[in-house]
Structures are given as structure tokens and as C-alpha cells.
């Protein structure tokens, strides 16, 4: 019987996940299909019950359901539990629903694919304190990045993650701007304002260190205002596309046991999104 998978969210129209997973199914001769499902917050419980009843083998979860879905699941893996957020659900052969979060590990794989894995002792500045920030901070810590600093408009939110995870320290945006030259890797983890065109830089990059690596988790647009400003300062930039592809590939592996070809997918999506 043909397996089927989905992505649930609100909005969902612009998701690249269906095209990505269906291309992988075809490439790997997997009898499966992947569909986008628009699910509002009010419909979430009914949607999970429906997915289960209709025999979905698994699904991805996007905004705004990553935390709200947790009560409907039977188990969480350690990373999802630590983050309090789920982006991948696996339905076991016994019908159990297990929640995973592949965002943080997907980011680390993307970063190391772009710049190598020899930067683990370098000072890292993480900008933002939302769900994505929590996952990336935890995954970087797990993967051996030992010098992490978080900054956020509301410092208390960054401090809460630092305290909970026992990582580094939290500083204000003002201090981040003043001490920017100290950091070798800067990761921009907020998407506020991008969709509406009201994005404002969290701080000036005038003090950016020569040879710094600057990453953004947003993949559409590929060149965010933050990355544009960093590139003008001579930084090595890492777009959010690699993270998107790798988090999807890790989900694919949870569902089917094989890791798909991420390189060709990054090239393909890069062309679609107008990259070089």
C-alpha cells in the first residue's frame, strides 16, 4: 500500500516541503506521496485524529502548531522534549505517535557543510530566543560548540534558555553590537517582519570581525537583510536553505530509514529561489 505523509500549518501555501519530499520519493523509488494540509489552531486536535485514522505514516509540523501538537502525541524524543517543540511526527506500526525536532540538528549539519566542523571552540553569538533559537542552541551544545552567547530584544527570554540549558550567557542587543568583533560565528534566528517587509536589523554590523561567519535560518528570501549587510562587510554567509533541506532529510530518515540526497536538492531549490 502506498504510504502518505503531510505537512500541517497555517499558512501552508508557500511550503517547499511537498516538492522536496515528493522529489526524494521519486529519486529513491519510494511508493509514497506528501501533501500540504492547511490546519488552523482550532482544527489541530481533529486534524491529528484524522491523520491517524486515515493512515498517514508521518507528518511535518510548522507554524503555529510546533508546541500545541505535543498533548496529542504519545512520546517525544529527548531533543523535542528539551525544546518543547515538535516539527516531525512518526506513526509507528503499533499506531503510536512519536514527536521529534529536526530543526537544530538540521542547522548544525548545514553550517558544517558550508564552513566545516573546525569552529567548535570559536565564540558564537545566537540572535533570537524563540522556538528555533532554543533548538539551535541545544543542538550546537550537543554537537560540541562550547562558547555560546545568546542575545535578544527581551534579554530575559534569552536568559531563560541559557539558564534552562546551562549554556554560555545572555546579553542585550546593545552589548552584542558593542562586542560584535569578539564573535567568529553569528546566527540570526528570528523571522520577525520578513513576511511583511518590516524587518529591522537587531543591531548594526559595523563591528563585525574580519572573516566572521554569518548564518540566517530564513530561506525565503535566500538573501535576508541581515545576510546582505554581513556580505557587504566581507563575511562568509550561510543561507537558511541548507537548514531547511537537512531538517527535511532527517525527518525523511525518521520515516523511512534512509537519508536522501541533500546536495542536489539544495542546488534545485537554490535555483528556484533565485540563488547563485
UniProtKB/Swiss-Prot annotation:
Signal sequence, renumbered to the chain: none
Catalytic activity as recorded in UniProt: shikimate + NADP(+) = 3-dehydroshikimate + NADPH + H(+)
SUBUNIT field: Homodimer.
HAMAP family registered for this protein in UniProt: Shikimate_DH_AroE
GO CC terms: cytosol
Family annotation (PANTHER family): BIFUNCTIONAL 3-DEHYDROQUINATE DEHYDRATASE_SHIKIMATE DEHYDROGENASE, CHLOROPLASTIC, SHIKIMATE DEHYDROGENASE
Functional note: Involved in the biosynthesis of the chorismate, which leads to the biosynthesis of aromatic amino acids. Catalyzes the reversible NADPH linked reduction of 3-dehydroshikimate (DHSA) to yield shikimate (SA).
Annotated EC: 1.1.1.25
Transmembrane segments: none
Record-level Gene Ontology MF annotations: NADP binding; shikimate 3-dehydrogenase (NADP+) activity
Pathway involvement of the protein, from the record: Metabolic intermediate biosynthesis; chorismate biosynthesis; chorismate from D-erythrose 4-phosphate and phosphoenolpyruvate: step 4/7
Keywords assigned: Amino-acid biosynthesis, Aromatic amino acid biosynthesis, NADP, Oxidoreductase
Family assignment from sequence similarity: Belongs to the shikimate dehydrogenase family.
Protein name: Shikimate dehydrogenase (NADP(+))
Active site residues according to the UniProt entry: 66
Originating species: Lysinibacillus sphaericus (strain C3-41)
Amino acid at each position: 500500500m502506498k504510504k502518505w505523509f503531510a505537512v500541517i500549518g497555517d499558512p501552508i501555501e508557500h511550503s517547499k516541503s511537498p516538492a522536496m519530499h515528493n522529489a526524494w520519493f521519486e529519486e529513491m523509488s519510494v511508493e509514497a506521496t506528501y501533501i500540504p494540509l492547511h490546519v488552523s489552531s482550532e482544527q489541530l486536535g481533529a486534524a491529528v485524529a484524522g491523520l491517524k485514522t486515515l493512515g498517514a505514516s508521518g507528518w511535518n509540523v510548522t507554524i503555529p502548531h510546533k508546541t500545541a501538537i505535543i498533548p496529542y502525541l504519545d512520546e517525544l524524543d529527548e531533543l523535542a522534549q528539551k525544546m518543547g517543540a515538535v516539527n516531525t511526527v512518526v506513526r509507528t506500526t503499533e499506531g503510536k505517535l512519536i514527536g521529534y525536532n529536526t530543526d537544530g540538528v538540521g542547522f548544525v549539519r548545514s553550517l558544517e557543510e558550508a564552513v566545516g566542523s573546525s569552529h567548535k571552540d570559536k565564540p558564537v553569538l545566537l540572535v533570537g530566543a524563540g522556538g528555533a533559537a532554543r533548538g539551535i542552541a541545544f543542538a550546537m551544545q550537543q554537537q560540541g560548540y562550547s562558547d555560546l552567547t545568546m542575545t535578544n530584544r527581551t534579554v530575559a527570554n534569552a536568559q531563560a534558555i541559557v539558564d534552562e540549558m546551562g549554556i554560555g550567557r545572555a546579553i542585550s542587543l546593545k552589548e552584542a553590537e558593542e562586542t560584535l568583533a569578539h564573535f567568529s560565528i553569528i546566527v540570526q534566528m528570528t523571522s520577525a517582519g520578513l513576511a511583511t517587509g518590516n524587518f529591522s536589523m537587531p543591531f548594526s554590523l559595523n563591528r563585525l570581525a574580519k572573516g566572521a561567519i554569518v548564518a540566517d535560518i530564513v530561506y525565503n528570501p535566500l538573501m535576508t537583510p541581515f545576510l546582505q549587510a554581513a556580505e557587504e562587510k566581507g563575511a562568509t554567509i550561510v543561507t537558511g536553505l541548507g537548514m531547511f533541506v537537512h531538517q527535511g532529510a532527517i525527518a525523511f530518515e525518521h520515516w523511512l530509514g534512509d537519508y536522501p540526497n541533500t546536495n542536489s536538492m539544495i542546488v534545485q531549490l537554490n535555483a528556484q529561489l533565485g540563488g547563485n
